[in-house]
């Protein structure tokens, strides 16, 4: 019995040491990433730090609904940063952005004319902001819907949350490498900066936002984030993987989820934020995640067990030393 307690104590102390290391890492990583521009921290340092942050948060947070919220919040910030990093690095190296290839593909898909051009010609008045512009911009602005749905699943169907959240995270993971490998200008940027598509495509979202603020119309802007992160559409990839999760809970929920995917796909193409090929690539990313799940799940479950052991090490330490007894 005494030997078993000694072994438990040693094992628990090891996990507790790891947990303390993660606890120290979290604020350090947050500070490093937040100050990266001011300090001139290179992407090769920032990327590993922000990528490990959600795992560190999971390791120091006891298993509960709050743990899902904490990890989800850290992961969304991690995605935002990893989405911005390629553009930040590219500004320093002046690496060119791809412009022509999506236009060629979309011209084939659109029967000679890119779908964005067709939609804006048919449905827009380029001189003003219409009710349709506002409605479609509202759909685009609802990109948080998949994350709100995850919150609803957590409250109403918690047994589905590990798979649903894991697949959404994997979807974001698969989109970010493309922003490094093939930085692609969206339709509005290709039209405005390079005169592609006869300069016809406008950034409708800019006009809607300025109209809502009662600001004068402007034909150019300095976009925050990553204006060359068009391929693939993470917006559509996230919506599609969430629709798949809803379909597993109930067919009616699945119909609602896929209806949102259709509306969001129309919105990003109409607004000039994405090409149709970006949308199709986003759907392909979601499908790839679903197909790969059976092969990746054993590794993920093992990682989850390790993180659970680390997170519960404080309680185990109390029991091993006798402090947990009344």
Language model features with spans:
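N-terminal transmembrane-helix/juxtamembrane module of multi-pass inner/ER membrane proteins
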Residues: 1-48, 60-63, 67-71, 75-147, ...
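Interfacial segments of alpha-helical transmembrane regions
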Residues: 69, 148-181, 188-196
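Membrane-interfacial alpha-helical segments at the cytosolic side of multi-pass membrane proteins
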Residues: 149-156, 236-254, 284-293
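Membrane-interfacial catalytic/cofactor-binding modules of polytopic membrane enzymes
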Residues: 178-248
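Interfacial helix-loop-helix junctions of multi-pass membrane proteins
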Residues: 186, 230, 263-288
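Aromatic-anchored segments of alpha-helical transmembrane domains
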Residues: 27-34, 78-81, 173-177, 261-270
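Membrane-interface loop-to-helix entry segments
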Residues: 132-146, 226-248, 276, 280
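C-terminal membrane module of polytopic membrane proteins
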Residues: 255, 271, 280-326
